């Protein structure tokens, strides 16, 4: 029986920022007999395939208690299951916690990270540590992983593109009529939505058309 272990921050189909992870897990479900997910937070998961099993950490626990529970949960799962590999999505801390367990069980670790990098000093240290501990790093582009220079083995970094179902978003447009406009995005400072709104208002369409912003914060 082929199984895979996934570590992520959130499993919630209704979350505007991380809800896409559901499609990733369902894609794994087609390739593996069982997909075991360890998530820091769990929301709506009714869209998951039946062979995707999600375990989450109690959000009411303190930070140290969460780390201990996470370690014990990963240790328990890896002891009772044989995994093809373990994928950690955007969580440096989870790959650091899991690393000694995965090494002991001889399970390959893969770390997905696509971001300019954290501003917080401690999170920078976590990211550098995770980059060293993991067996492989996958990212969207050659510029989407910030700490290439710290890698002990440059060949562990693999550029695979964004994991997006392009066909679901592509629609051929033969002509364009001036209608209302929409921005679909996570609501955060890094997305510079204020600049987009300002640009729209100052454009020739700004006085005669409506702009809607659809999205939500990361947390």
Task: Please state what every model-predicted region is.
Residues 29, 109-139, 149-153:
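A conserved, positively charged/aromatic
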Residues 1-43, 189, 201-205:
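N-terminal subdomain of nucleotide-sugar transferases
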Residues 39-44, 132-170:
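A short, active-site helix/loop in glycosyltransferases that binds the activated sugar's phosphate group
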Residues 70, 83-107, 117-124:
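An aromatic- and histidine-rich active-site surface loop
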Residues 8-10, 90-91, 113-117, 142, ...:
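Histidine-centered beta-alpha loop that forms part of the nucleotide-sugar donor binding/catalytic region
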Residues 5-6, 173-191, 197-201, 211-217:
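Conserved donor-binding/catalytic core segment of Leloir-type glycosyltransferases
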Residues 8, 37-39, 161, 210-215:
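Short beta-strand segments
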Residues 30-69, 73-80:
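Conserved nucleotide-sugar phosphate-binding/catalytic loop shared by glycosyltransferases and other
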């Amino acid at each position: 029986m082929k199984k895979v272990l996934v570590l992520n921050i959130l499993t919630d189909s209704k979350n505007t920022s991380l809800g896409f992870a559901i499609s990733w897990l369902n894609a794994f479900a087609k390739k593996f007999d069982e997909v075991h997910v360890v998530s820091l937070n769990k929301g709506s998961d009714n869209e998951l395939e039946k062979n995707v099993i999600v375990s989450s950490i109690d959000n009411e626990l303190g930070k140290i208690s969460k780390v201990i529970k996470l370690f014990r949960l990963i240790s328990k799962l890896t002891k009772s299951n044989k995994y093809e590999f373990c994928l950690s999505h955007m969580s440096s801390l989870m790959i650091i916690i899991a690393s000694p367990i995965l090494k002991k069980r001889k399970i390959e670790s893969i770390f997905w990270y696509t971001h300019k990098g954290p501003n917080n000093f401690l999170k920078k240290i976590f990211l550098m540590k995770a980059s060293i501990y993991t067996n492989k790093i996958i990212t969207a582009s050659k510029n989407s992983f910030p700490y290439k220079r710290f890698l002990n083995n440059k060949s562990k970094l693999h550029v695979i593109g964004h994991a997006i179902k392009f066909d679901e978003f592509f629609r051929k447009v033969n002509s364009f009529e001036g209608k209302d406009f929409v921005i679909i995005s996570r609501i955060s400072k890094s997305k510079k939505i204020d600049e987009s709104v300002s640009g729209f208002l100052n454009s020739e369409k700004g006085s005669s058309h409506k702009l809607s912003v659809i999205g939500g914060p990361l947390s």
